[in-house]
Amino acid sequence: DDTVAYSGRATGPKHQDDVDQDVWIADFSPLREKGRFYLDVPGVGRSVEFEIGDNVYDFAFTTAMRGFYLWRCGCPVEGTHNGIRYAHPACHLDDGYEDYLGREGHKRDATGGWHDAGDYGKYTVNAGITVGCLFMAWDHFQDKLQEVSLDLPDTAPGYPDFLQEIKWETDWLLKMPYPDGSGRVSHKLTRTNFSGFIMPENDDEKRYFTEWSSAATADFVAMMAMAARHFKPYDAAYAEKCLEAARTSYAFLKAHPEPQRFHQGDFRTGGYQSNDADDRLWAAAEMWQTTGEPQYLKDFEERAVVAPTRRWGPATTGKIDEDWDWGNVRNLAMFTYVLSEREGRAPELLAAIRNDVLSTADRLVAQAND
């Protein structure tokens, strides 16, 4: 109604190098009224309308989470956004073949999971950063997330929608270990080359399990350990299955401490090769957090004091990284350790991680304000 709700003075200008523009900051934090507003600056004009309220991020959150559903592989999906319908029938129902595991022409079920990208491949290492962050979101915001409705097919009855979506991926991950019970986990499941820009149901070339890698196996351990503790209230038997799979793969890694990359060979799809030090660290952290067993705590604390080897970025002796992604999950390990309520952590290491969390946060804030 054009009534003034708040007035003040902007500060600036401040040059932003990333966009090569001068910007002014309008701080209206004291405004506590909810509703739709606009800024009117004399000599400049009127801004677009914006909303102040408790639920302003709901649309962004639900849209992002619905995106995971639309990335599902092995089932029909359908959604509408801004009046446009997005849908495809079930795809990749022949996943996958074991030719590169020494069993030419043999097919083993590995349907499900999320497509990684437009090539529709499914990658264990890439799943790690995604599943890990989603479970951590549940750790921090369970009281809100358990009430969220994402309008999903009920593929895991009794689970909250948020966890149902994660379980679609963990169901697939449980199909990625070698069938010999060794605990080795295939690095990925893809075609030998990229598919091109086609709909997923038209991608009908054979897709293969690749050889195992230690990074994929360690990430599998971490994800299964997290699944075991977060899914236990909803399905204790499934949680135990996840934990046993994690134990088996962890034992294999302990018996084979050397880094193992998978052989890319005939494959031209994403390699996603990764040093495994951060992955093994994360595996130890999640196994300890889930079980409380001291051998996992010992493994974590021994690894946590070793200077990290990074895929890229500057070397550092700090415990927390500013830049992290699928190829560096070290922060996930550190956060699990520092936020745990379990007893027995090493006071000096705990203090070092806490201090580095704060100093890294301070640097990021300073960079944002620069």
What are these model-derived regions, one by one?
Residues 23-25:
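Intrinsic-disorder/low-complexity, polar/charged segments enriched in Ser/Thr/Lys/Arg/Asp/Glu/Gln
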Residues 1-7, 12-21, 30-49, 57-370:
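Glycan-recognition and catalytic cores of secretory/periplasmic carbohydrate-active enzymes
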